[in-house]
Regions:
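Short hydrophobic/aromatic-enriched beta-strand-loop microsegments
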Residues: 59-65, 80-81, 123, 225-229, ...
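Mg2+-dependent phosphoryl-transfer enzymes with acidic/Ser/Thr/Gly-rich catalytic loops
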Residues: 1-2, 20, 181-258
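Active-site phosphate-binding/coordination module
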Residues: 18-118
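Non-catalytic pre-domain segments flanking phosphatase-related domains
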Residues: 1-6, 25, 29
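Conserved acidic, metal-coordinating active-site core of Asp-based
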Residues: 98-101, 105-218
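Structural recognition of alpha->loop->beta junctions
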Residues: 54-69, 74, 125, 130, ...
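Asp-based phosphoryl-transfer active-site loop
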Residues: 2-17, 219
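Residue-level marker for buried hydrophobic side chains located in beta-strands
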Residues: 4-6, 62-63, 208
Length: 258
């Protein structure tokens, strides 16, 4: 059995718009030929509605939260880890104090905050709400993922808060930086651990493709690790194959070239 692990942002979508409709068509052809499709992403489940329901991308598994949660084709949970409430609250407070855009998901709800304005968060956008953010956060028993965004698109604050998190909570969480974003997930979670989990439980031949730094563990874990010609040179050097679009990789798989 062959299994494709595909990143979302920068791979299938850019600014929440499909990069090419041919990618979806190719994934459907791959699935029709008996392959399994997995989306391997830093997104949480509440951010996947547009892709799965509205745009109708086919899937058999979901690796979410940079490996923190793995779901089957019915969206039933196969694997899940959480960040302890006390740890998550500290990290969120640091982000709020630094006036970064912060957001979290506890598996059922997702909220963000910037400039002391709270938002209900989804893949359809951010809806302002009147609640005090940290008071709202204390109602969550734990967190699946916490994300921090430096709004000026620089990385100095991201670098500092990453260091602070790792110094105090390095045995509890992992940090996955991606440009001016930082995803914080439970320890021993990455896209690569998601690939390995499904590989061990299905004995599939794995093909992985992504474009950014948080995709490296996935690219390296796959039997055939792939990236794009627009990815950083250091990422391209780690990959077995380099493409312009996902559908090119699918064509090579179905054509027996890889």
């Amino acid at each position: 059995m062959k299994m494709v692990f595909c990143d979302i942002d920068g791979t299938l979508y850019r600014d929440n718009k499909q990069i090419s409709p041919l990618n979806k068509e190719a994934l459907m052809r791959f699935r029709d030929a008996g392959g399994k499709v997995v989306y391997c992403t830093g997104r949480h489940i509440l951010e996947m509605g547009m892709i799965l329901e509205k745009d109708g991308y086919p899937f058999d598994y979901l690796v979410l939260n940079n490996g923190g949660a793995i779901l089957d084709g019915n969206k039933d949970t196969l694997y899940e880890k959480h960040i302890e409430a006390s740890v998550g609250l500290d990290i969120l407070q640091w982000g709020v104090d630094a006036n970064m855009f912060v957001h979290m998901c506890d598996g059922k709800k997702s909220y963000g905050c910037f400039n002391h304005q709270s938002f209900a968060h989804s893949d359809q956008g951010d809806i302002p709400i009147p609640d005090d953010y940290m008071t709202l956060m204390k109602k969550s028993p734990s967190f699946q993922i916490i994300s921090l965004n430096q709004e000026n698109r620089q990385t100095d604050q991201i670098d500092m808060i990453k260091k602070r998190i790792e110094e105090k909570y390095g045995s509890y969480v992992e940090c996955h930086p991606n440009l001016h974003f930082l995803d914080v997930v439970p320890n021993n979670c990455s896209k690569g651990t998601g690939v390995n989990y499904l590989k061990e439980n299905t004995n599939a031949t794995t093909y992985t493709i992504g474009d950014s730094w948080n995709d490296l563990s996935m690219i390296e874990a796959g039997d055939h690790g792939c990236t794009f010609d627009y990815a950083h040179d250091a990422i391209q050097k780690k990959a077995d194959h380099v493409y312009s679009y996902v559908y090119e990789m699918i064509d090579d798989i179905l054509g027996g070239k890889i």
